[in-house]
């Protein structure tokens, strides 16, 4: 007996199951069954994640457990999907909803390579992307503070390149050094632009996820991006009902929402371009007018020059960077500072993890909830 998931439009109906030429044709799983199975899988994976986190906390302490909470989540998800999908078995959610995975044009069971690819997309890729994003943001701050080092390396690197090459070894060394210098400068520019690119990348990712969900509501094949990338579908092997609900109307709503977001994005881009052109025109007129503006005097009556203003700004910037506090839970620089109702500030991930266990402030024990936490942007204390 062989499974066939691509049975055509007429064979996807509930009454199309049966024997035809010795082949048992099962209908494709409907959207409610796939969504229900995904919710069950997330629930059981969270159970394993909590068990791994508790074991890790008892072994190494709360501080180290908070520092490696993302790795514990990755470990829990990997264990769940490797023990189920990786071994060729149904997950608990799939077994609950009577669906199985198929792939390929003939609707056969996924190969081990395809299952491994799905597990990698489902668990490791989001973790790696988040780690790269965090590391890039940290290095962007480090590069801003060490511009002198990169300036010196940029000055000294041409001396290495301009050395006379009298042999093949010197030529290869100069080529390698030139390539290394270009890669370092490209990496430096990319890291410096990352804080600006990150919000745009997140918006694009949200649009891609919504577009995938819209396609799922229309066609009913791939609920997750990982399944679409690996080509894993579902067929229904349970008792067929007379009416299997579909979610095309939700796809229409998502399509309307995406159109509105696209129109809003175009409007914002046009407004930003118009604003930048107006600012450039005003700056140009100010520079060509020859005026230097009104003189500004300090408390002693001396004229404040541009160099003094730059010095004051640099001093204030350095003091502001030094004033950034540390989280009392992880004892490191606060990432995404979040304030509690009582006024204490922690890392977003640290205080959220704390509120999962105890809904109170770690310092003053004031009761608080997840909804009462406020993430502070463009400021820290």
From Swiss-Prot:
Chain positions covered by the region annotation Disordered: 1-22
Entry keyword Zinc-finger: yes
Pfam families hit by this protein: Pex2_Pex12, zf-RING_2
Gene knockout outcome: Embryo lethality at the heart stage.
Subcellular location: Peroxisome membrane
The EC number(s) this enzyme carries: 2.3.2.27
Domain of life: Eukaryota
Topology relative to the membrane: Multi-pass membrane protein
Keywords for the protein's UniProt record, in alphabetical order: Membrane, Metal-binding, Peroxisome, Peroxisome biogenesis, Protein transport, Transferase, Transmembrane, Transmembrane helix, Transport, Ubl conjugation pathway, Zinc, Zinc-finger
Primary location group: membrane
Sequence ranges on the Peroxisomal matrix membrane side: 1-30, 84-112, 220-246
Species in which this protein is naturally found: Arabidopsis thaliana
Residue pairs linked by disulfide bridges in the UniProt entry: none
Protein name as annotated: Peroxisome biogenesis factor 10
Catalytic activity: S-ubiquitinyl-[E2 ubiquitin-conjugating enzyme]-L-cysteine + [acceptor protein]-L-lysine = [E2 ubiquitin-conjugating enzyme]-L-cysteine + N(6)-ubiquitinyl-[acceptor protein]-L-lysine
Pathway: Protein modification; protein ubiquitination
RING-type Zn finger ranges: 327-365
Gene Ontology annotations of biological process type: embryo development ending in seed dormancy; fatty acid beta-oxidation; peroxisome organization; peroxisome-chloroplast membrane tethering; photorespiration; protein import into peroxisome matrix; protein monoubiquitination
Residues where Zn(2+) 2 binds: 342, 344, 361, 364
Induction (UniProt): Up-regulated by hydrogen peroxide.
Cytoplasmic topological domain residue ranges: 61, 155-178, 267-381
Gene3D superfamilies documented for this protein: Zinc/RING finger domain, C3HC4 (zinc finger) (3.30.40.10)
